[in-house]
Amino acid sequence: MPKHDSLWLKSLRWIQKHLVHTIVVPQDPFADLNLDAFRPLAYVMKTESLSDIAALSEITAKLGLPSPYEPLVANGVIAPRVVCLQGRKPLFGERAGNEPFLECFMRLLAVHKERPELDIQLVPVSLYWGRTPGKEDDTMKAAVFERENPTWLRKCLMILFLGRHNFVQFSNAVSLRYMADEHGTDMGIAHKLARVARVHFRRQRKVMTGPVLPNRQALFHSLLKSESLRKAIQEEAANKKISETQARETAIEYLDEIAADYSDSLVRIAERFLTWLWNKLYSGINIKGAEQVRQLHHDGHEIVYVPCHRSHMDYLLLSYILYYQGMVPPHIAAGINLNFWPAGPMFRRGGAFFIRRSFNGNKLYTAVFREYLDQLFAKGYSVEYFSEGGRSRTGRLLAPKTGMIAMTMNSVLRGIERPVTLVPVYLGYDHVMEVATYHKELSGKKKKKESVWQVFGAIRKLGNFGQGYVNFGEPITLQNFLNERAPNWRTELADDPEQKPSWLTPAVNVLANRVMTNINDAAAASSVTLTSLVLLATDQNALERSLLERQLDLYLTLLKKVPYTTYTSVAEGDGKHLVQQGLELNKFVVCADPLGEIVSIEASQAVSMTYYRNNIIHLFIVPSLIASCLTHNEQIPRQQVVSIVADFYPLLKAELFMGIKDVPAYVNQVLDFFIEQGLVVETDTLTVVPEHTSQLLLLASSVSETLQRYAIIFNLLANRPKMERSELESESHLLAQRLGALHGITAPEFYDKKLYGTLSVKLKELGYLADNQDKSNINRIRDQANSLLRPSVKQTIVASVTAEHTV
């Protein structure tokens, strides 16, 4: 290799500086890969390449990592900073052997034998000039851009045409101290290191580029030859009294309607457009948990992303983030309503496949869709779908639609060998551009059909949207889930493949709820969501700025000292910083008088801001319930607080998809936190410290509307124990409307019929709607709910229920 200060290399670096734009994965190797800045470090690369090392040099200079041109000096031994597995490929003939590179491994290992305290970090580095996966029928393009083993001439062409799409990926370091101690330092170990590194680089390339793309028509013909589709076509012909040729044509039409037509060229163009768009819209996109997903890809998992659905922006945001995190954008299940010009064709070329909202008993369509989904899994494409079935209009997670999850489960049952893993994803925004539309729809206005004019309308409204949040939740590997739910599932299916197992539907329902719970476990507490939570808990949606900042400091400290889960993310900075962020986004207004500043939510925006509060209400609902217990009782034993929370938690869990593993332990941690913060003192009982009552009252207000719902339900059940589920739902909804009208409750979810349906299902499951239920439990929970309400609200509920019962 020429010296790094030679005229040739200086010229090469100058050319690359103007032609090459490099993206680093991960963005912060020190933080994401736990690299130790105080230990010596060497790089291992697949192929010796002057241009690759020049690109790496640019990046290491920016990241503060050792330059690949600087030799590694350890114990008096000088070794190259970069170890390559194979030499450069000449324009003609064969490349040189890898003996010189094995010698490098040997020298590094030998140094560890001489110096027991030495531990060199060996960091694998992969470089990609473009990320085209290639096609099954590639010919000319593959010959020109042979990416894995290019000659210097091909590399020049790649830099010229693909230099703006250069990716440098760092991987977890290998400890040479561990290798030397565990396996020795001879040539055999050097060979083993080289073999492991080659496998690593091969897997990394597949993670970065994805599997080769099929010819679309060839894919259709392949699918039509499958046994299940042939059978479905025959049944369609028999049932509709048409020829098999006509039924086959219908199946092809369905495939054409459904199937994606992924284009790497369009993805590259979209990447540039989206980079411009995000920079225009957002001041930053916060990502948490991407490394675990990258590792799952590397380990050969079939990944299914299951994000929450807040906005049409979700389709773009997750794919963009995955692309920049060194993973292939998934094939996305999009509603057929989005298949309009020009969005539909663009989405399809970006990897979207389209699904009808209802299959309406169409067996042929069902068979075609299922076979297409199976093929995506079989070929190794990652998939994305929204299990809620539509965008949330209230900011809360919707009850899951189980259709896609059931199809994924069935694909596993039909024999996918690789592990299939669902990755829940929390998507959050400081500003959702459809919120005003959601409010109108909840008020009774008919939803507009998606069209190109809506796209233009949305573009006109682009502005400062603050920050976006992408948090990856705890993954669920389906094979492990099935082993947990039905240990003998493989044997059962082998014995009778055609028989639908009795445990399948309940297992799908449990899985769907677990996915939603894991999404909420990964929530992002941001400046907008936290400030909305505080201000909407006040009577006039307004608070003195200093008190608001103090309350936000309390919430931030609570989330950090008693974390909801390890997947949850919390905004950086203090309360003062969060308030300033919210004001800069024009989400809140501030006015000043001689006594100080008051921050508030404008009356016209109050209902819309409940959307952001609802994104994180589950993070604070139990602490809020605890605060309510404390502020409604002068003294209360710790165990009584634990018992009250235990009574309400099953309903909270069903309503808000909560996943607290040990509820009593969590309650005690929150109580200990209140004591540590000086809000509460404990002798034999718990007592609120008078000067901090206002903070706990403000926190307690966040659970008040939830407790009002439960008070309505349990007062009805106590008065009419034999009430049917349908009656309970309708009567609860009617009383909620009356309560809202009398007490000014405007939150949309308070009147949501589906929410009362969810609660009634849970009540039946808990036995509260059974003929032989224990009425004492209902009365106890009714009394607890009533005791935590404002007297005027309690009076309205009790009087309304009593009057209705009398009638």
Swiss-Prot record:
One of its GO terms (molecular function) is glycerol-3-phosphate O-acyltransferase activity. HAMAP family: Glyc3P_acyltrans (MF_00393). The HXXXXD motif is essential for acyltransferase activity and may constitute the binding site for the phosphate moiety of the glycerol-3-phosphate. This is Glycerol-3-phosphate acyltransferase. Pathway: Phospholipid metabolism; CDP-diacylglycerol biosynthesis; CDP-diacylglycerol from sn-glycerol 3-phosphate: step 1/3. GO terms for cellular component: plasma membrane. Disulfide bonds: none annotated. Its EC number is 2.3.1.15. Signal peptide: none annotated. One of its GO terms (biological process) is CDP-diacylglycerol biosynthetic process. Belongs to the GPAT/DAPAT family. A motif (HXXXXD motif) lies at residues 308-313. Its main location: membrane. It is an enzyme of class 2 (transferase). InterPro entries: GPAT/DHAPAT (IPR022284), GPAT/DHAPAT_C (IPR045520), GPAT/DHAPAT_LPLAT (IPR041728), GPAT_PlsB (IPR028354), Plipid/glycerol_acylTrfase (IPR002123). It is a peripheral membrane protein. It is found in: Cell inner membrane. Keywords: Acyltransferase, Cell inner membrane, Cell membrane, Lipid biosynthesis, Lipid metabolism, Membrane, Phospholipid biosynthesis, Phospholipid metabolism, Transferase. The lineage of its organism: Bacteria, Pseudomonadati, Pseudomonadota, Gammaproteobacteria, Alteromonadales. SMART domains: PlsC. It catalyses: sn-glycerol 3-phosphate + an acyl-CoA = a 1-acyl-sn-glycero-3-phosphate + CoA.
